[in-house]
UniProtKB/Swiss-Prot annotation:
This is Putative uncharacterized protein YGR160W. It is a single-pass membrane protein. Almost completely overlaps NSR1. Residues 68-82, 98-110, 123-168 have a biased composition (Acidic residues). It comes from Saccharomyces cerevisiae (strain ATCC 204508 / S288c) (Baker's yeast). The chain crosses the membrane at residues 182-202. GO terms for cellular component: membrane. Keywords: Membrane, Transmembrane, Transmembrane helix.
Amino acid sequence: MTPPMCSNSFFNHSSSIDHDSLPTKIVAGSSVSSFFCFLLEDSSSSSSSASSDLRFLSLDSSFSLSLSEDEDEDESELEDSFDSSFLVSSFSSSSSSSEEESEEEEEESLDSSFLVSASLSLSEDDEEEDSESEDEDEDEDSDSDSDSDSDSDEDEDEDEDSEEEEETALAFSSLACLEALTSFLLPFTLVVLAILFYPAWVE
């Protein structure tokens, strides 16, 4: 603010006064006017300083308000970013936990399917082994039956052979008996016949 100029008619009653010659020409009216001008200038300077102080205070307060608003905005932005980062981290953690749960469920399902397939394969192997053992038992039974049949046939053949041998032995023994009997009876019969028919032959 520019200080007000001393333009009052009371102070400027003498237009012919040269202000440059105030120190040399001392006039009562001019000294009074200069004194009041000094007072007015002092009051105007004080008012201008006060207004400048007020302006500075207003600028300072507006600057502080703008700074506080900026700080509030920064804090709100930080809070928003923190909230967004927290939401992102929570979402990522939840998604990772859900992925881990899904992976665990898949592993459990794979393990259960593997166990089921392993049990089925073991049961199939057991059934195959049982069928093979049954076939082997049947083969052994058939072999034993065939062996028993062959043994019985061999026994029958041996019995027949032994019977034939016994029969041949009996025949040979009977022939031997006949030969012995004939060898004994033939001279005896000749002697008996000679005794019986000798007198007839003599006559």
